[in-house]
Every structure is written in C-alpha cells, then in structure tokens.
C-alpha cells in the first residue's frame, strides 16, 4: 500500500500531470494583460482588475486562481502594467509578480502595433506535509518544498485594425525544474504560447457582438482553444457564451456601472469525460476604470 501511494504521488507530480503550469482564464478578453504584456496601457484609460476562478467545485484539491492586474495608460506611446497571480492545484502552488512595459505605435490611420515585455518573479511550492499518508511519520514527506522566487521574462505583440485585433504572446520564457530537490527529476515547466484574436461590430442600434478566440499551444499536449461570443447592450450589459474544445461550455454576464465599475461572472460546465467526476466552475471579475485625463 505504501509503495502504491508513492507511485500515485510520483505520477501526480510528473510533467504530464502538471504541464498546465499557467492557469486557465475564461474572461480573458476583459483582462488580456494576464496573457500578454502588449496590452499594458493599451486601453484609453488606466484600470485595476481583480479576478478569482474556482475550478471544478466539489473536487478536493481542484485548481483555484486569484489575480490582480493594473494597467497604466500614458499620453505618449508607452504603457505600463503590474500583476500578482496565485494558482493552486492540490499540494502545488504557483505565485508570480510581474511588471510590464508596452510600446504602442500607429502604422497607419487604422492600424496599431503594440509590443510588450514582462519581467516577473515566480515561485513554485509543494506542500508535502499536507498529504495524507499511511505512514504519517515518513521523513520523505515531512516538509514543504519551495523553489523561491526566480526571475523570468515574457513577451507579447498585438496588431489592431479598427475594432479587430490579433495577439501572440509567451508570458513565461525561462524553464525551471524541481530535480535539484530530488523529488522527481522529470518534472519541468513547459512553454505556453498564446494566440488571441477578436473583433466587434454593431448588429442593431445599441447592440454589438464581440466574437473572440484564444488558442493555447503547449508542447506534447493537445492544442486548447476557447471560443467566445458576447453581446453588449448599450455599452453596459454583456451576455456571452463560450466553448473550450472537448472540455467545457460556459455562459457569462457582465455590467458596467457609472462608466467605471465593471463586474463580470462566468459559469462553466464540463462536457468531456470529466463530467462524471467534476462539477461546475465559477469565475468572477471586478474591474475599476479610472477617469480619462483631459
């Protein structure tokens, strides 16, 4: 039995199990800065965003993501951003702090190019003493493990044409592993590449449709795609649906109050074989928009 438990732990901490180092976001279009530094200061006003995602409610050790981002818009072509992200899954926890810089320039009357870089510090920790073992006094699992905050870089580019955009990014470039702790030498980070695209157009007076897609490319894993369609009424009320390929369906609602307070909520249900063991996912987003400087 003891060897079986050790085997399960080793499998759980293999690279295949934790290849998703970076968390999933359903409402990525409302906070694209978490995925690409090219969006730092891109909006017409500065903003602060808080997001909280609780995945697979009812499953012990299910992923939980908390994030805070800030975007500073300036009068020149520069933009700045900051972020704090914490992602938990079982005994694993990832924490990161990041600072972004982006440069925005007009290539023509309707085309804008943005390029951004991110400097971040990332910590990965493993809570071994919280695991339930047959032998509670086993010294191999008597303490927590942390990598400490390690430096990293990220990049992103964005091309906009009127109300349409396409963006490519790699938020974390450097790859680290846990093998110096002799827990599992095969554990290591995988590269995450993101492709985002979206547009918006008016379908009738006061109603705009906003389709978008986000594609994640991770080596040695299937490509993941989020497809979203949101209807915005009077630039205040949002209704949307989303689909993650072979994984989940979601619905969302959002409201903008006094042109500066935005609250969004997304509800997801699994549609894959996971539906037998997982329940729903909730995602909440709060955003404050600063007044535009005259």
What do these predicted ranges mean?
Residues 4-14:
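Sec-dependent N-terminal signal peptides
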Residues 20-294:
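Subset of outer-membrane beta-barrel
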Residues 1-2, 21:
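N-terminal hydrophobic targeting signals that begin at the initiator methionine
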Residues 15-19:
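Sec/Tat signal peptide C-region and signal peptidase I cleavage site
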